[in-house]
Amino acid sequence: MDSEKKEINDEACPNTIKPENKKDQNISKINKILSDNTVSEKVFDLLFLIDATGSMSSYIKAAKDETQNISKELRNLYPEYHFQYGYVFYRDPIDSHDDIHEMIDLTDQVNNLPEKIKKIEAYGGGDLPEDWAGGYKLVNEKITWRNGVKVIIHLADAGAHGTDYTSGDKYSSEGPKLDNYIRECANRKITIVCFQIGSEPHKSFSRAKMLYNNMGNNNFKIQDFDQNKKDPGYFTDLVVNAITKVT
C-alpha cells in the first residue's frame, strides 16, 4: 500500500483512521471470523485432507515438501495467531480392503512434520470414487480442533462414494454418511477450501458445497488445481492465496 503523503498527528486528529496495510487487513478479517463465531482465542488450525490413492503421488509430495513454506508465509501474514497443522490421508477401504486411512493430528511442531509425513505413500484405490466419508469422519471425530479459526484444504482428483456424489456408484449407502459429516463441518464453522484436480471430483465437491451452504454457512470454496504447474512453490502459493480469500 502506498505510504501517506503527509504525516497525521494522532493527537490533533483523534478520529482519523489510517489505512491498514495488508498484514493489518488480514488480521482484521480473522478477528471478524472470531467475533462471528463467538470465539476469542487467537488460534488458527489448518488441516490438509488429501486423497492418498495411487494417482496422487505427485500431489502428496508437494504437501510433504511445502508444509514449512506454507507455515512461514502464514506466520508472516498473521503474526498474532498461534498455528497448528495436521493431515488426513484417505484412501478407499470400501472397495479396496487393503487400503487404510492415515492421519497426523494438529500440532504446532512444524519442524517435525516432514519426518512424519515422509512415510505417507500414495497407493490403493479400487474403483473410481474414494472414501470421502471415511476422511471426513476422521476430520470430525479424531482431529482435536481448537476454539478458533478452522480451515480444511481438501485436495482430490476423484469424487466420493454415493450416487448423489458420483453417478452410478454401487455404494449408495455412503452418500448419507458423507452428507452428515459435511453438515457437521458447517455447524462447527470449519471453512473448507477444495482444490479439484481435473473434472472428476466436481460433482462431489458441488454437492458438498450445496449441503454446507444449506446450513447457513458460505465458507465452502472450490477452485481448480492446475495440473500443468510444476513450479516449486505452486502449492504454497495456492494454499496461502486461498486462505487469504476466505479469512
Descriptions of predicted regions:
Residues D2-T247:
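Divalent cation-coordinating acidic motifs and surrounding scaffolds
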